[in-house]
Amino acid sequence: MAAPLGGMFSGQQPGPPQPPPGLLGQASLLQATPGVPRTSNSTLVDELESSFEACFASLVSQDYVNGTDQEEIRTGVDQCIKKFLDIARQTECFFLQKRLQLSVQKPEQVIKEDVSELRNELQRKDALVQKHLTKLRHWQQVLEDINMQHKKPADIPQGSLAYLEQASANIPAPMKQT
């Protein structure tokens, strides 16, 4: 169905990769986790991949298409999904453990990553603020245009004496002589 994950990335050698330096002797994705039954050459990644494929296989299985009981189909799919979720949790736990080990061994690396994430978040939020300011300016201009349209008819007096009324309003009042 799908190609194995081992050959998906360029430059990756087939076969099990070596654990990172400093982590020798510790459980890795290539070694079985204590307390979890595994086949001799199986890894968490392999099991995650096979359980993912099993989820899809159970959904498109010819047995189910040929009219198997709906409850039986549901049970089979539920079992496949539960297995996939269980292995996904184990994989997540593995990476969380590695993250914890990294934070203990190289705390400055974790701080650098946090600072980088905060900078990226600030840039994203600044861009969002600029986007909203642009929209705000646009709508302010729209409102100003609407207000100007409403004021224009009121500024121009109507009727036969309108011109005289407007002209006389602009003439300054005579000054009183004392």
Swiss-Prot record:
Region named Disordered: 1-25
GO CC terms of this entry: cytoplasm; mediator complex; membrane
Name of the protein in its database record: Mediator of RNA polymerase II transcription subunit 28
Organism: Bos taurus
Protein family according to the UniProt entry: Belongs to the Mediator complex subunit 28 family.
One Pfam family recorded for the sequence: Med28
Cellular compartments annotated: Nucleus; Cytoplasm; Membrane
Quaternary structure and interacting proteins, as annotated: Component of the Mediator complex, which is composed of MED1, MED4, MED6, MED7, MED8, MED9, MED10, MED11, MED12, MED13, MED13L, MED14, MED15, MED16, MED17, MED18, MED19, MED20, MED21, MED22, MED23, MED24, MED25, MED26, MED27, MED29, MED30, MED31, CCNC, CDK8 and CDC2L6/CDK11. The MED12, MED13, CCNC and CDK8 subunits form a distinct module termed the CDK8 module. Mediator containing the CDK8 module is less active than Mediator lacking this module in supporting transcriptional activation.
